[in-house]
Amino acid sequence: MTHLSDLDIANQSTLQPIKDIAASVGISEDALEPYGHYKAKIDINKITPRENKGKVVLVTAMSPTPAGEGKSTVTVGLADAFHELNKNVMVALREPALGPTFGIKGGATGGGYAQVLPMEDINLHFNGDFHAITTANNALSAFIDNHIHQGNELGIDQRRIEWKRVLDMNDRALRHVNVGLGGPTNGVPREDGFNITVASEIMAILCLSRSIKDLKDKISRITIGYTRDRKPVTVADLKVEGALAMILKDAIKPNLVQSIEGTPALVHGGPFANIAHGCNSILATETARDLADIVVTEAGFGSDLGAEKFMDIKVREAGFDPAAVVVVATIRALKMHGGVAKDNLKEENVEAVKAGIVNLERHVNNIKKFGVEPVVAINAFIHDTDAEVEYVKSWAKENNVRIALTEVWKKGGKGGVDLANEVLEVIDQPNSFKPLYELELPLEQKIEKIVTEIYGGSKVTFSSKAQKQLKQFKENGWDNYPVCMAKTQYSFSDDQTLLGAPSGFEITIRELEAKTGAGFIVALTGAIMTMPGLPKKPAALNMDVTDDGHAIGLF
C-alpha cells in the first residue's frame, strides 16, 4: 500500500484564512499582523489576560531512535482530538531549524494527518524569527570586535571571549575559525567559532522573556567574556542591549498558524533540547493560556532532556504548573532499546519490546518525580503488530500507568480521542507539581541530582576545566541558576550507544557555560556539539523545488 508523504498530505489540505483561525479563539483583527493569507504574528499587547488561564499539557517521549518518535505529530494530533471533542484548545510548538531540516530530520511540523500548516513556509524561514535571532547574535559579535578594535576601553581579554557567532545550518567547518586577519584595518586577530542558531543564548532569551522590557533586561545580563583579571563583561557594559532588542521587536511576537483540521497553533522559538532548554516561548504558551482552556505543548527529545528542562527552567520562569504529561512511545523505539538493530526494527519481536520497556518505564517514573501523572501514548506505526502493542498495554495495566494507542498520523484528531480522554481525566485532578531541585543548592549538587535521579547514573565527574569554572561561577554569584544539561538524546547516559535503562554509570562534565542572560548554566557532557554537522547522506539530497515554486522532499 502506498502512503502519501507528509508534504503531499499538506499540499492536498485546504487552509482556512488566518483571520478565521484567529477569530475562532477570540483574537481580534487589530491584534493580528498577517504574513500572507495563512500566517500571522500576534500583538500580545492586544490580548486580554484572563484570570482562569488554560491548563498546560506537556508532550514528551521515551529515548528516541535517530528518526524521532513522532512527538510533534502526537502533540498536534492530541490538540486536534481535543478539538474533535469540542474543547477550546490551542497547540504551542517550536519552530523548525533549517540545519536539521537539511540534515537528518527533514521537516518538523508533525506528520501524516496531524500537521501544522503551511508546512513549506514553517520549515523554510517561516516569519523570519530565526533570521532576526541570528542577526542579533552576530551583531553582538560585531560590537564586541569593534569595541576591541576601537581601543578596548573595557579591557576585554580577546582570549577569553565566550560569545560565538551563529548560523542556522549544520556546518562543522565553522566550529573553530580565526577572525580579524589581514592586517590592522581588519580588526584584532582572535580565535572564534560558530554555533547553530538554536544554541544561541539570544534564542533562549527570546523563549524565556515575557515582554520586550524583560527581553532587554535579559540581553543586558549576557556575559560576553572576561577582562584580563577575570572580571565578567556584559552586554550592559557595551551598552547595546537596546539595539539588540530592537532587532528582535517583531521576532518576540508569537506566530499563529493552523493544523490540518483547523486547530489554532502558535509556533514560536526553537531551542534544541540536547544543547539548550528545548521549549517553545513562554509568550506563546502564555498567550495560548489566555485564549484557550487547554494548551498542548512539547519539549524536545525525552523526559531526561526537554521535559526536565521544561519543569526546572521554563516552568520556574513562567510561573505555571503542567496539568498533565504525555509520554510518547513507539514499538520501534522499544525494540531498539531491547537490542534490535536499526535495519530489523520493522520485524515483529515481542521479546525485544519486553526488554526495551525499561526505557519507557524510567521516563514514566521521571515524570512522577515532578508530582504529575503521566499518560503513555503508543504512537502507532504501520509495521507494529497486535502482539507487540498488547504487551505494552498489559505492562501499563500491571504498573497502573494510563495508556492509549494513538493513530493520529493515519486518522488525525479522531485517532487521538482515546488519548485525549485519558488526559482529560488527569487534568481534572489536582497534582502536586514540584521542580526536581531547589535553586539554592550548589551547582554541582543540582547536576548530581539530575544525573542520579533522572538519568539513573551513580556519579558525576568534573573535568579540571569544569572544576575551575565551578569555582569561578560561585565567585561571580552564579550558583543559584538552574542547570541546562547538554547531553546525547539517545541514552540516559553520556554514551549514545548505552541504550535501555542503564544504571551505575558515571557522567563527565567537560565544560560549563554561563548563560547569565537566559538565567541558566549549561553543563556539557560527552561529545555533544553546539554546531552539528551534516550526515553522509543529508535529507537535502531528496529535496527540490518545482518550476512553479513548490517544495519537494520536505517529508
Curated annotation (Swiss-Prot):
<protein>
    <recommendedName>
        <fullName>Formate--tetrahydrofolate ligase</fullName>
        <ecNumber>6.3.4.3</ecNumber>
    </recommendedName>
</protein>
<dbReference type="InterPro" id="IPR020628">
    <property type="entry name" value="Formate_THF_ligase_CS"/>
</dbReference>
<keyword id="KW-0547">Nucleotide-binding</keyword>
<keyword id="KW-0067">ATP-binding</keyword>
<keyword id="KW-0436">Ligase</keyword>
<dbReference type="InterPro" id="IPR000559">
    <property type="entry name" value="Formate_THF_ligase"/>
</dbReference>
<dbReference type="GO" id="GO:0004329">
    <property type="term" value="F:formate-tetrahydrofolate ligase activity"/>
</dbReference>
<comment type="similarity">
    <text>Belongs to the formate--tetrahydrofolate ligase family.</text>
</comment>
<comment type="pathway">
    <text>One-carbon metabolism; tetrahydrofolate interconversion.</text>
</comment>
<keyword id="KW-0554">One-carbon metabolism</keyword>
<feature type="binding site">
    <location>
        <begin position="65"/>
        <end position="72"/>
    </location>
    <ligand>
        <name>ATP</name>
    </ligand>
</feature>
<dbReference type="GO" id="GO:0005524">
    <property type="term" value="F:ATP binding"/>
</dbReference>
<dbReference type="InterPro" id="IPR027417">
    <property type="entry name" value="P-loop_NTPase"/>
</dbReference>
<dbReference type="Pfam" id="PF01268">
    <property type="entry name" value="FTHFS"/>
</dbReference>
<dbReference type="GO" id="GO:0035999">
    <property type="term" value="P:tetrahydrofolate interconversion"/>
</dbReference>
